[in-house]
Regions:
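Active-site-proximal beta-strand/loop segments in catalytic clefts of secreted hydrolases
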Residues: 2-5, 78, 106
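Flexible loop/turn segments at secondary-structure boundaries
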Residues: 6-11, 82-85, 110-113
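Carbohydrate-binding surface patches
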Residues: 58-97, 103, 147
Length: 150
C-alpha cells in the first residue's frame, strides 16, 4: 500500500503523494506510474532464474512472474544507476513463445518530477521482439515491464 494516495494543491502535509490535484487538473507522479505498472502485473508463480543482471549489481533488480489465470509472463527490470545496464533473459523453459511482446518503460533523471504544468515522466509502451535467449538494455533510472502472452 501507499499512503497518502491523493493530495490537493496547497493542502499537503508531506511529500511524496501519488496523485496531486487542484480544482481543474490532476497529475500522477512517477511513483504512481510505477505502482500502476507493478499492480497490474502481479503473478502467482515466480521464476528466479529467467532474468539475470551482470555480476552483483546493487543498482539493478529483476523479477519474473507468471499470471496463470491470464497466461501472461511479466519480466520486471529496475535500473537505479546513472548508466544503461544489460539484463540477460532466458525463456528456454517456455513453449510456444510469441514473436512479439510489449515493454512498458518509465524513466527520468532523479531531479525531474511531474507537476501541474508538465508531466515529463510517464510510461511509454512499445512492441519488442522476443526470443528464447535475449538481452535487453535498461535505460538509466528506469523501470520496465515486459508482458508476454503465452
Amino acid at each position: 500500500s501507499y499512503a497518502p494516495l491523493l493530495a490537493k494543491k496547497g493542502q499537503t502535509n508531506w511529500n511524496p503523494d501519488l496523485i496531486y490535484f487542484d480544482n481543474t487538473k490532476v497529475y500522477p507522479t512517477c511513483s504512481y506510474y510505477v505502482q500502476q505498472m507493478f499492480g497490474t502485473t502481479a503473478g502467482d508463480y515466480y521464476y528466479g532464474d529467467v532474468a539475470k543482471v551482470e555480476g552483483a549489481d546493487k543498482f539493478q533488480g529483476t523479477s519474473c512472474v507468471l499470471n496463470t489465470e491470464k497466461r501472461e509472463l511479466y519480466i520486471k527490470v529496475v535500473n537505479a544507476a546513472a548508466e544503461a545496464k544489460k539484463t540477460a533473459i532466458n525463456l528456454s523453459r517456455f513453449k510456444n513463445l510469441p514473436a512479439k511482446a510489449t515493454m512498458t518503460t518509465i524513466s527520468g533523471q532523479p531531479d525531474v518530477e511531474n507537476n501541474y504544468e508538465v508531466q515529463p515522466i510517464a510510461p511509454v509502451t512499445k512492441e519488442v521482439n522476443i526470443s528464447k535467449k535475449m538481452n535487453i538494455t535498461a535505460e538509466p533510472y528506469s523501470c520496465s515491464v515486459i508482458r508476454i502472452k503465452l
